[in-house]
Design a protein with these regions (language model features):
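Hydrophobic alpha-helical segments, chiefly the membrane-spanning helices
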Residues: 2-19, 23-352
Length: 352
């Protein structure tokens, strides 16, 4: 019998390992096990829904407050909107890291980056050609590749500690300074590109703050619910935390980007897709990951390597596909196909 919430994963794992024996001795155990798995499945779904909705409220409230304070759309687009795309991952990782679930955190970050390229860019390119600015090709993509390579080196060493976190945050700060400096040289163009991601709805000051605070609360609740559902559900099914974080949770937390890309493409703003994906992936590695590390240092297991390699290969491939300043539908099909192959390999590994 588990007395505390922290003991839930251990108890669930024990139930999962002994389920075959227990079913022979207790016919009622089958329905009990199914109910437990459904419960944690519903908890996972509820947690993800809270993360997505909480992130939406957070960005709506933040944008409204920033607008009322006279902050330009350029600054909003480069900071708040970029943060909003990674807020579900950040909320989940902080809570999961506090409870020692480091593999779930890494799976969430790496899996989200893989899904952003394979699903978001792939599906967006299948709908229409995605134009890519020269700045993304020459600055943001190489920086993303460099950051991904550094993460690979860190995983090879075996531990992600505070030194790595400080290094990532320094690089992120330099990138933010570069964004603002380059943005000021051509503010009108960047502001116009960011405009499609910023709501035009006007809210009162009280309403904006209410949305922001409600969003933060929902993110906290959603992060805890997702952690419980993912960890305990995975263990009951014999899956590792990194598999759940890198597939189920990663796909779910990337759904807002998928929907946004589809809507942007249909409304004639496909240029937002590549910039949003690259920005979100940079944010995940250079901000979400170091914050997670500062909460609790991460020890790397051998299972993490698959996700690091796939993330690096997908990132480099996407960069090469943008060399002619666009991603064509057939190239989008390649990205989606590779992502499906990745999921198939992970599924096959679980089964075997």
């Amino acid at each position: 019998m588990c007395a505390t919430m922290e003991n839930l994963p251990d108890c669930t794992q024990s139930v999962g390992r002994s389920s075959a024996t227990s079913l022979q001795s207790n016919p009622q155990m089958d329905s009990i096990t199914v109910f437990a798995q459904n419960y944690y499945g519903m908890t996972l779904i509820l947690g993800i829904a809270l993360l997505i909705f909480g992130g939406h409220l957070l960005v709506e409230g933040s944008v409204a407050i920033a607008t009322r304070l006279g902050i330009s759309k350029l600054v909003i687009g480069l900071t708040i909107v970029a943060f909003s795309t990674s807020s579900p991952e950040l909320a989940l990782n902080i809570i999961a890291s506090m409870n020692g679930h480091s593999e779930l955190c890494l799976g969430n970050i790496f899996g989200s980056n893989i899904a952003n390229i394979g699903l978001v860019l792939g599906i967006g390119a299948l709908i229409c050609k995605l134009p890519v600015t020269g700045r993304i090709i020459k600055v943001e993509f190489p920086l993303l590749i460099f950051a991904t390579l550094i993460v690979g080196v860190a995983t090879l060493i075996g531990t992600l500690n505070a030194y790595w976190a400080i290094g990532f945050l320094c690089l992120f700060s330099f990138l933010m300074w570069t964004w603002f400096r380059i943005g000021n040289e051509d503010e009108s163009q960047v502001a116009m590109q960011s405009e499609g991601a910023i709501s035009e709805v006007q809210y009162s000051t009280i309403g904006a703050w209410a949305m922001l605070l409600t969003g933060l609360v929902l993110l906290a609740l959603g992060g805890k619910a997702t952690e419980i559902g993912a960890v305990t559900g995975a263990l009951s099914l014999g899956m590792s935390e990194i598999v759940v974080g890198g597939t189920v949770v990663a796909i779910a937390t990337s759904l807002p980007e998928v929907v946004t890309t589809i809507i942007a493409a249909k409304k004639g703003h496909p240029d937002l897709a590549v910039g949003n994906v690259v920005g979100s992936n940079i944010f995940n590695i250079l901000f979400v990951l170091p914050i997670t590390i500062l909460v609790n240092p991460i020890s790397i297991s051998s299972d993490v390597w698959l996700y690091v390699v796939v993330m690096f290969v997908m990132t480099v491939l996407a960069w090469f596909l943008t060399m002619d300043s666009r991603i064509k539908p057939k190239e989008g099909g390649i990205l989606v196909g590779l992502y499906i192959a990745f999921l198939a390999y992970v599924t096959f590994s679980i089964v075997t």
